[in-house]
Amino acid sequence: MRSEAQVPPAQKVYYEELFQIADVDKDGVIGLNDASFFRNSMLSNDILRDIWQLSDVNNGYLNIDDFFVALKLVSLAQMGAPVTLDSIKLIPVIPPPKLNDIPPLKNDWIISNGEKQNYIDLFNKYDEDGDGFILGSQAKTIFGTSGLPTKMLSHIWNLSDVSKDQKLDCQEFIMATFLIRSVLKGYELPNKLPESLITSSHYISSAGVPSPKIPEWLIPPPERIIYEDLFNKNQQGGIFTGSQAKVLFEKSGLSNQDLKLIWDLADHNQEQVLDKHKFVIAMFLISQRKKGKELPQSLPQLLLESSKSTFNPSSITSPPPQSSPQSSQLQQQPPQQQQQTGDSKYNINLNDLVSNTTPIGQPNIQPTTTTTTTPATASGGLNVSGLLSPPPQQQSPSIVGTPPSTITREGSFTFDNSGGGNNLLAKPPRSNSITRMNSFQHQLPQQQQQQVSPQSTISNTSIGSGSSSFLSTNATTSSPPPIPSTSSQPTSSNNSSITSNNNNPISPTSTNITQLFENIEKVKQQVFEQERIRQEEIQVKLNQELQLEAELKQQLAQEQQQLDEVRENVKEEEIKLSSIKADNQSLKEQISTARVDIKSLKSQLEQQSSLLREKSELFDEQNEALSHLNDDLKEKQQELQKNKQQIEQLLSSIESIKQNRTDVKNQISTVTKQLNDSKLELKQLAEEQKQQKQKLAEEQKQLQQLQQQQQQQATSKSLTSVKSDDNITFLSGINTNTTSTNTATSIPTASVSGNDNWDFFNSPPVKSSSSLPTSPFDDDKTFVPTFTTTTTTTNNNNNNNTINTSNGNLTFTSPVKSTVNQLKSSNSSVGGTGGSVSTRKLSGASVSSNNSFNDNTSIDTLNNHFGSDQFSFNSFGSNNLTAPPTTSSSTNKVQSDFFGVGGGNKDPFGGDSNNNPFGEESTSSIRDGGSETLSEAHTLFDKDPLFETNDAFQSSKDPFGQILFSNFTKDSFGGESVSNNSNNSSIISSNTIPSSNFTFNTNSTTTNNRQSPIDSDLFSDNQQQQQQQQQQQQQQQQQQQQQQQPTQSNQNNQSFTSNDSFDDFQTTPTPTNNNNNTTTTEFGVKFSDTTFGDSSNGDFDFGSNVFGQPSANDPFSSSIEPQHQPDTNNVSSDPFKGGFDDFGSAPFSFDNKFNEVVGDDSPSLTTATTTTTNDNDNGTFVFNDNNNNTPSPFDS
């Protein structure tokens, strides 16, 4: 339990009830939701915030001990005390706080009798001057010991001081003390005194009457005696001068202002001197001021009267009781009024003097006697009776001649025997110095019964330690006069009778008188003896009292000296105390500041601790992440090592490829030289062509005559259509996952007879084509280029291919007949499995060549079946539609609709497909002299090393040659390869399907000079013509047999598709013949002098395929690694054929490098046709002369 939470039992019960009220949610603690309870105290939010922070030691809630501390702090704030925990420790009991709408702690406010008697005893103890009051200064000291705050004690004083006279009587003191005790018990002070408290505090003395109140400015007689004695010792001439009074008064330690006021009050008649009673007034005022009592502004009348020696205090306090004659005879000692001063310095008790008289019963002369009682007082003093009333003077009888004797003994009568003995008893003298008189009783003869009764006033005077003499005149004068005795008259009558008797002469009764005197003398002696003994006793007691007085004075001097020393020590201690208080105050301020700093630092520490915990958690997370990263780093390093090894392997491959590149460049340079030589030869051939044109015109006439003769001879035979070699089929199609079947149709041109009478120089008949637009810029008609082919046979030892000219286009076709299913595989650079179609632009003419590069070649006997199936290609996008063979009309014109016109097989552009990419086939008539001697050009192409296959280009994925020679079906720039399901060495036939890998195969055959019907010099002799006629007849029979198999052959071999993933095909529209419903599509890739992927000029677009859709295998948008399949045809273990390196992109344009080697005048290599079906592909290359500026509808 917290030390600050300790409360009295009454408060504990009340605070527990308050805790139950404040705990709204009944969870046993005061949380933030319950903190609104403290707003009932009406304190500010700042004070309540400080109270909460001091009470809250559990960080967010208060338990019951913390709640008690908070209530104490609220009460301190309401009282105006500092709101600190130290304030709780300094105040023993803090009253409950005042809360709105909450009842306070209940109290009945009734004082029990036992408790009230304790308060009365305290009042009597602290009422030092015995005036029945406790002044404010005394109350401050008394009540300050309770430890309650000054503000609370001030409230208690205001409640208790009912009379508002700035002092408390006994009843008010009882109420004030009870209120203090109630606060210490834990009760709250009331705003006004309850009636029950006033009723229960009423004080009744033990005598049954309320306690008397001594007048405020009454000087007690003991004090007056002391002041008078002090005056007698220091007075000069019965007065006190101002200088003497100043020296004496300054010893009191009062201020000059108070001493001046005391002088003015004492010197009431402004005489500037002090007599005895003024001196007593001044000393009494000094005594009261030192006790803390305020000085009056004017001299009270009671103070002036009580300073005189003749003042009777009994007349102020209570009148003396008067006894009746009967009661006075029975009562020997009346009640005495005692006055207590309460001052420890004085031990004086003043008793009222009470006189008792007893009359003498006999009429005879009886002397009056005074009885003396001497009860011992508490102080050891003596009780002195009042003075005995003086008896009348008696004269001794005249018969006695002795002179009158006077008894001066103290306490006895004086008998005067002089005067002739007339007076028997002399009148005792009155002495002021006599303070005690002992009465005696004259013993009469036994015959006379005498009654002795006391006849004196009893007064008891106690001599204290402060008196200077045992006997004092003032004591006698200040005593009230004795009450007259009832026996005074008889005594006087007896005395008068005696006196009268003494005046008479001596009678016989003188004897009796003498005897009477003797008896009186005896009585005197007895009385004297008794008085002597008693006087001795009194003297012993007096000596004792004087000795005691001297000792007390000596002790008083010592005490006074010690008192002065103590005062000096007190002053020094007060100075030290004030300095200590100042130090304590500064320390308290420092402590409060330190506590504020501690609170702020504590909050900062908590924030830093929370931040440290967060940073620690973050550090752990980062450390764990770092460990994971280290693990990943190790793995990556291992992968890096592997990649480095692979890179080293690849670098070795690159070095070998670079070496191959060097070889290729050397070959290209060689080819370039050959091309330049070919250009010169072509120029010579062009000149020769012009010469032959003249001869051709003459021969045409002879040819027409021969044709007429042949027609007559062949009436019984069916005409055989011989396909002219000048028909160039640029049929190219790409099927995506479909198979298109097109049948190539052999279009007969003319039947050349082997008659020796055939005039070579006669012009054969020309069949004109139907009217078609001759320009692609005509608006009315669709442009369909039409040309007529004239067949001219020449003999050439190196090449037996037929060279045809049509519209200035020089074309040669190398037909190949497939006789075996699969030819022998070899690593030769030139294969002979396919037809070669090449085109060159020479003097405005276009020379095309269909080359198929393949290292697997076969040598076979050439058959001039110009309608061979190898040269029929499926149209692009045929969608697996099969078209029957179509025979051209008499005009022999074939049109191709690229714009969706016509029927037949549908190409992807909506037009019908036909095998002839140039439209209608030409007739056998020759329009111009374009068929000059071009055998040398054909021979050049056959011998051109550019088209020879090098092992380095067979299957290598060289970045500089993969576009021409790599085996792929996807984009080589990271595209995914497909499996090669067929052997690259397969030759296109009815039984085998070419490989789907994009392989450029050079399909060529060895020439057979014996099968060439025409000499190379274009001049025929009779022997050669006869052999030619025989061969033509055999060829016609073979052609008839082959015409029956075109459909089957086309179905097996012409389903070619291509999916090289370049998505960069350019289409070239060709004319369409609506009558024949045929369509021919030609498109190709132009390798211009631009970087791959640059689609700014429309040459390439790697982002979309031919259908306009995004390529699924775009190497720049997919991270799919290439899946390779090893080449099973790599029989020779060519390291560049079967290897799968990852060089999927060309670092520079092929054309650029090619042109750098060849030169700007060399023709650019362009892929004219790419056809791939499933696993088959084929390609045709077109060489365009850049120097030819003649516009063509097929120019890209």
Swiss-Prot record:
UniProt-listed PROSITE patterns: EF_HAND_1, EF_HAND_2, EH
Q: GO annotations under biological process?
A: endocytosis; endosomal transport; protein transport
Q: Would you tell me the protein name for this molecule?
A: Epidermal growth factor receptor substrate 15 homolog
Q: Which organism is it from?
A: Dictyostelium discoideum
Instruction: Check the record and name the SMART domains matching this protein.
Output: EFh, EH
Q: Where are the transmembrane segments?
A: none
Q: Which Pfam families match?
A: EH
State its location(s).
Cell membrane
Q: How does it assemble?
A: Interacts with tom1.
